[in-house]
Design a protein with these regions (language model features):
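N-terminal pre-domain/capping segments
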Residues: 1-100, 118, 125, 161, ...
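Acidic/histidine-rich catalytic cores of soluble enzymes
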Residues: 3-7, 119-201
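Active-site-proximal loop/turn and secondary-structure-junction residues that shape catalytic pockets
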Residues: 11, 36-38, 76-78, 106-109, ...
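Conserved strand-to-helix beginnings and helix N-cap segments that scaffold or border functional pockets
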Residues: 17-18, 83-86, 114, 144-145, ...
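Short Asp/Glu-rich motifs
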Residues: 43-44, 81-82, 112-113, 143-144, ...
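Intrinsic-disorder/low-complexity, polar/charged segments
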Residues: 51, 82, 109, 143-146, ...
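Active-site groove signature of glycoside hydrolases
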Residues: 93-110, 127, 132-135
């Protein structure tokens, strides 16, 4: 069985979506993940929902190459997040043919975090999108077990899952046993990374 490989935008974050799609096609990928929301002041985002010309160029590149958009990112679930403000983001994802949204846990109130995750899943469902929560060792949801617990507290939405990044999985001390018995819909895809399993000093 073969599986599609998608190029994550962070790998080539200085390239516009259209440029990145063409690079992905030339290097053998079948899909891409696009960063539509800026994450840090020093790392760009490409808000296609607010830029019709760039949206047209991106869709043209998809038609030209035959690639598809696998996911869009990056929703930081923070204390002040208004989920309804993500309507145009979700609409852009649907227009691009994306299947999932990547979200990250940056609210120290775990109950509120679970509620916002559930609300994002509900909003995304209206656009035919799923949502995956990516865990990071430096956040309040540092590992796989904690991310699965947030999903449970959110009511285990049908379109809600967890994203395992191999780098964060090993650096967080998550256990392979925690993967056992999980339905594929809960862990729909994973991120592969060639960084060292342990960080430097």
């Amino acid at each position: 069985m073969t599986r599609d490989l998608a190029l994550a935008h962070l790998t080539t974050i200085t390239l516009s979506p259209a440029e990145m799609i063409r690079v992905a096609a030339r290097t053998g990928f079948q899909a891409v993940g696009l960063r539509l929301i800026q994450v840090t002041p020093t790392s760009p985002g490409y808000p296609l929902m607010d830029d019709p010309a760039s949206m047209r160029a991106t869709r043209s590149a998809l038609r030209e190459t035959g690639l598809r958009v696998h996911d869009i990112e990056f929703v930081k679930i923070e204390p002040g997040l208004d989920v309804s403000s993500l309507e145009s983001f979700c609409a852009a994802g649907a227009a691009l043919g994306a299947s999932r949204i990547i979200a990250a846990p940056y609210d120290p109130d775990l109950g509120r975090l679970a509620d916002r995750y559930a609300a994002l899943c509900a909003l995304a469902a209206g656009y035919g999108l799923g949502v995956v929560l990516e865990f990071f060792p430096w956040t309040v949801v540092p590992g796989l077990a904690e991310a699965l617990e947030i999903r449970r507290r959110a009511g285990a939405p049908a379109n809600g899952g967890v994203l395992v990044d191999a780098l964060h999985f090993y650096r967080s001390g998550s256990r392979l046993a925690d993967l056992d018995g999980q339905d594929a819909s809960v862990l729909p895809f994973l991120h592969l990374c060639d960084a060292p399993a342990r960080g430097g000093d």
